[in-house]
Design a protein with these regions (language model features):
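Sec-dependent N-terminal signal peptides
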Residues: 5-15
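Phosphate/dinucleotide-binding and metal-coordinating scaffold of catalytic cores
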Residues: 19-335
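N-terminal secretory signal peptides that target proteins for export/translocation
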Residues: 1-2
Length: 335
């Protein structure tokens, strides 16, 4: 990011800091207990019904409303993502202060390596945080679920999950506003952010994104949000469960892309100047150690998964050692 923009962001973050919640300013694992009618909530995953739950953490108790969320994951997950709705007067002087509606990414399935996909998707968000300030922050949770209905195989069980910063909180933090439009002009995008997104998606092996509105979406863009900051728009990606880095058990590439596995990298960025691509590549390469440390520091990830994930990321960095070659690849493949 150019120095002028960096200084602007630092000032904006400083101004909004006083009203920000501590929830996303801490990277330690937050222990919570979520108690409620889980099996009733999952009776009809296509419903948006909200049910009362109790969330306990740090010796505090919050009465919240919970509903199922997500699109594709409702279809493939036995334990789909959730939305937690907090009462405004119930979060004062807690880690959830100033929070209202929060997205919770859950473990999805209990098969195989239960925690691996969740932890690696969390890592994808953290990696993007390292290369762009305009990104969704996340907080890792270790959750004890208690089903008061007793309709699940286990009444009480522990899983990892993570919370995602809301779009309104991100907008306030960076001094911008969320945009809900049906399309976006490439000329309206911040070039540095756009190039960083393109290369980041290639780094994590994610092809499940686009600057075009998807068939089942009302607004632009597929698996990304737009934010107006100053006179330009910033594309902020989310939903990385189909990325090669995560390699979720249910992940399959779009048949039109002509790749057989999600772990195969395919550049899906749009055409942009060589200088901007080089700058974005340098930004990502400069965080190589920090990026790999995100994986090394994941709690609950097996040694086998940790090594395999680091090797996957290192494959990118080895290719990126020849900057001219990889940028030429990007330019040949750009849309």
């Amino acid at each position: 990011m150019p120095l002028g923009k960096l200084i602007t962001f630092v000032l904006l973050v400083h101004v909004s800091h006083a009203s920000a919640s501590s929830l996303f300013e801490d990277n330690t694992v937050l222990e919570i207990n979520l108690t409620g009618p889980i099996s009733s909530l999952f009776d009809d995953v296509n419903s948006n019904k909200q049910l009362p739950f109790v969330l306990r953490t740090n010796d505090l108790e919050h009465t919240i409303k919970v509903r199922v969320r997500g699109k594709s994951r409702r279809r493939v997950c036995s334990f789909p993502p959730l939305r937690l709705n907090f009462a405004a007067n119930d979060t004062v002087q807690s880690v959830f202060q100033d929070q209202n509606k929060l997205k919770l990414v859950t473990h999805c399935r209990d098969r195989g390596s239960v925690h691996a996909s969740t932890l690696k998707e969390y890592a994808a968000y953290r990696i993007f945080n390292l290369v762009s300030d305009v990104s969704y922050r996340v907080r890792l949770l270790h959750i004890t679920y208690t089903d008061t209905d007793g309709g699940l195989k286990e009444k009480e069980f522990d899983r990892y999950g993570f919370l995602i910063e809301s779009a309104s909180a991100l907008a306030e933090r960076v001094g911008g506003q969320a945009e809900h439009v049906t399309g976006v002009s490439l000329r309206s995008l911040d070039n540095q952010q756009a190039a960083t997104v393109y290369i980041f998606q290639y780094l994590i092996g994610n092809t499940d994104w686009s600057l075009v509105t998807a068939d089942d979406d009302d607004t632009c863009c597929h698996n990304g949000d737009l934010f107006d900051i100053g006179s330009v728009r910033y594309y902020v990606p989310y939903d990385f469960d189909l990325a090669g880095l995560v390699n979720a058990p249910y992940a399959r590439p779009d048949p039109s892309l002509r790749i057989s596995r999600v772990t195969q990298r395919l550049y899906r960025g749009y055409c942009i100047s060589t200088d901007v691509l080089m700058d974005a590549l340098s930004t990502i390469k400069a965080r190589r150690v920090d990026i790999l440390d995100v994986i090394r520091q994941l709690p609950g990830l097996s040694l086998k998964e940790t090594v395999a994930t680091i090797i996957y990321l290192e494959e990118f960095f080895v290719r990126a050692d020849d900057e001219n070659k990889i940028v030429k690849l990007f330019e040949r493949r750009c849309l």
